Design a protein with these regions (language model features):
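Loop-to-transmembrane helix entry/capping segments in MFS-fold secondary transporters
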Residues: 57, 150-159, 283-284, 364-377
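Intracellular juxtamembrane helix-capping segments at the cytosolic ends
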Residues: 134-148, 351-365
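Structural signature of the two symmetry-related core transmembrane helices
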Residues: 89-105, 315-330, 407
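C-terminal transmembrane helical hairpin of 12-TM major facilitator-type secondary transporters
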Residues: 314-353
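Juxtamembrane intracellular "pre-TM" segments in multi-pass secondary transporters
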Residues: 3-20, 221-253, 431
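Helix-loop boundary and gating motifs at the non-cytosolic
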Residues: 4-73, 78, 248-290
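Helix-to-loop junctions at the C-terminal end of transmembrane segments
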Residues: 73-87, 179, 299-313, 394-395
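Hydrophobic core of transmembrane alpha-helices in multi-pass small-molecule transporters
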Residues: 31, 101, 116-136, 338-352
Length: 431
């Protein structure tokens, strides 16, 4: 059966210069996000901080789990604040919230509050980032869908996720200087626990506020007519019907859930296991982990962006998932310092987080992009249970058992996507 014709190249009303500005803003936004990645990527830093406070593996996995559970909020925002004129405010205010809770973690450590209180604040940090990042990311996808043509989206993703991770490498080197006595960059700040975490969170908070300037610089084309309450209700109902009945959206969401569960939720256990493999007394290699994670992501980001311009959205889903499978095989088979390469492979594979929303956005009409990406986030919120599951498996049967579980989930996802997803999806109303 032949596949539908993909969207045309002129599906954006903005001029090439305005689209280039949006691509630049999108890339700049992600550069700052990546620069603060040791804090904004809820997982490794949070898990190791809670572990050093004396918590179990399950508690150490809670920030990542709570982050996932609370990513459903964007659905309500997309339903009740659908107007394109609200896109910029919906970028700015979540950034203010993220900066505030990040400062709160630094203050809790500075004031030498009890480990229990700091644990609660760190878990709350994961919760606030879960709600705020969910709104940010769904809004960004609508901005990109409205402000950049389909034919140029590969360039936007290539620049954002090729150049952006280089900034994460800088952030990781800074973290390594804070946490290790023999960092890669040759400079150590000599910070002991918990001052190293204090400086890390305190430095990230003001950088997050700079992102608001970029958020205000996007050019967003506004439709001539805003939907009325009644028409919006019909759009919501129709959008829900499409999301749960239209094949590219349904199987795209299922694939996303499986890949997220197998390739991202396991990351905390992979990091915790590094201490045993490397015989570390503390998480001194965490900066190296992050550097490799984002260094590989930068190389993969440029290559994958180019690959998207030459192939199709489905190829990107299979490619990123395959990279994650290779990463988990590395975790299971390699010991010693070479074990750290697994963070690079898994980091490169993490770009599934860009190409699954792209697949969903390509399958959606412009008015439904934010809602459909929000529904995808709702599906992703259940990944939090995978984080807790991996923690429980680790506590009972050991971390190796959790790694085998994650690898099996990824392989199942690849088989499903290869069999069920069309290569070039189009919105339901264009078929």
């Amino acid at each position: 059966m032949s596949e539908p014709i993909p969207p045309t190249d002129d599906d954006c009303p903005l001029s090439p210069a305005q689209q280039a500005r949006n691509i630049f803003c999108y890339a700049g936004f992600w550069c700052l996000v990546y620069l603060t990645a040791p804090v904004t990527y809820v997982g490794l830093t949070h898990a190791n901080l809670l572990k050093e406070l004396g918590n179990s593996d399950m508690v150490a996995n809670l920030p990542h789990a709570v982050y996932q559970w609370l990513t459903a909020l964007p659905i309500l925002v997309a339903w009740f604040f659908p107007q394109p004129k609200l896109l910029k405010p919906l970028l700015v205010w979540p950034l203010v919230c993220i900066s505030s809770i990040t400062a709160a973690v630094a203050l809790a450590i500075w004031w030498k509050l009890s480990p229990t209180v700091i644990t609660v604040v760190v878990i709350t940090h994961g919760a606030v980032l879960g709600t705020s990042n969910g709104v940010l990311l769904t809004t960004l996808w609508e901005v990109l869908r409205r402000g950049v043509s389909t034919s140029r989206r590969g360039h936007a993703l290539g620049v954002a996720f090729g150049v952006g991770p280089l900034f994460a490498c800088v952030g990781s080197l800074a973290q390594q200087a804070m946490f290790s006595t023999s960092p890669m960059a040759g400079m150590s700040l000599g910070l002991a626990f918990p001052q190293n975490y204090l400086v890390l969170f305190a430095a990230a908070a003001p950088l997050m506020l700079l992102e608001t300037l970029i958020a205000a610089s996007f050019v967003v084309p506004l439709p001539a007519d805003e939907p009325t309450g009644q028409s919006r209700f019909h759009e919501i109902v129709g959008g829900l019907r499409d999301f749960f009945t239209y094949r590219p959206l349904v199987f795209g969401a299922i694939g996303y859930f499986l890949v997220y569960s197998g390739g991202n939720a396991i990351f905390d256990n992979v990091s915790l296991h590094a201490k045993d493999v490397l015989k570390e007394a503390s998480a001194s290699s965490m900066g190296t982990q992050q550097f490799l994670r984002f260094g590989f992501k930068a190389l993969a980001g440029l290559s994958l962006g180019w690959l998207l311009t030459k192939t199709n959205p489905k190829t990107m889903l299979l490619t990123t998932t395959l990279i994650l499978v290779i990463g988990m095989c590395w975790v299971l088979s390699v010991t010693g310092s070479w074990y750290l390469i697994s963070f690079g492979l898994l980091g490169a594979g993490e770009l599934f987080g860009a190409y699954f929303p792209n697949y969903i956005a390509t399958s959606s009409s412009k008015s439904q992009v934010r809602a459909n990406v929000a529904y995808l986030g709702l599906v992703g919120s259940f990944v939090g249970f995978a984080s807790v599951l991996y923690g429980a498996i680790s506590d009972r049967w050991g971390r190796i058992a959790s790694f085998h579980t994650a690898t099996g989930i990824l392989l199942a996802a690849m088989i499903l996507m290869a069999a069920a997803l069309p290569s070039r999806p189009v919105p339901q109303d264009l078929k």
